[in-house]
Amino acid sequence: MHLSLTQQCLWPLQILLVSNLLLWENVAAVPTSDSGLGISELLTEDLFDDAVILSQHINGLAIETRRIFLSNNFSSDMFVKFTLQFNRHDEFVVNGLNSCHTSSLKTPKTEKEAKRISLPDFVKMILSILRAWDSPLYHMETELKSMTGAPFSILARVKEIEVKNKILLKRIIKIAKKVKHGIEENEEYPVWSELASLQSTNEESRFFALYKMSYCLFVDTDKVEHYLKHLKCRYFDGYMCQDPENQISLQ
């Protein structure tokens, strides 16, 4: 059969298109990384990576906020006073800092304890910590705005933590679906009940409420960061734990 000039030109192009389609099919059929993870697993890994990075950033902001509280003229006198009282084992300050509103949650203190918790329950614990800070962060920002002399550097960081905490919560809800944890709208979490102290007309009471919040916020953001690293390692059967960036140090 003789081909026209047009057909002769199109024939190589058709062969090329078919070859490319076969090539793409072969690419899709093999693992997409050296670790042997497929596309779905890689997307899940990205989700975990995003959550870990975000939690690290939030923890960093909490550390910065506490540092500014301790060094700024607005609050340093009161914060240094409470720190000295804590170092002297003053009963009021020690008891206050040992009663963060999330302390009712049974959280692991060691990696061995963490491994005894199922993945769904581990995700539930992280969600509870994040949800427990939704109201306190809002009121912390609101009260700081009304306090004379409150520095913008603190306000900006508290606001950023509040916003990023909500974003991280959404990320963890997506992760919860991966580990088969059914999300319930009315799932219980620790309730913060110290608004009266934060709004007190007594300056020392008000500043101690801020001192305690900044301390508890640091403790909990640090926990969330380490718990997410632990969760990531377990979800991917431990191979992630070989990376120094994912070494676990539970608080």
From Swiss-Prot:
GO terms for cellular component: extracellular space. SUPFAM superfamilies: 4-helical cytokines (SSF47266). GO terms for biological process: cell surface receptor signaling pathway; female pregnancy; mammary gland development; positive regulation of lactation; positive regulation of receptor signaling pathway via JAK-STAT; response to nutrient levels. One of its GO terms (molecular function) is hormone activity. Keywords: Disulfide bond, Glycoprotein, Hormone, Secreted, Signal. The keyword Nuclease does not apply. It holds the Pfam family Hormone_1. Belongs to the somatotropin/prolactin family. PANTHER family: PROLACTIN-7B1 (PTHR11417:SF17), SOMATOTROPIN,PROLACTIN (PTHR11417). This is Prolactin-7B1. It comes from Rattus norvegicus (Rat). The gene is Prl7b1.
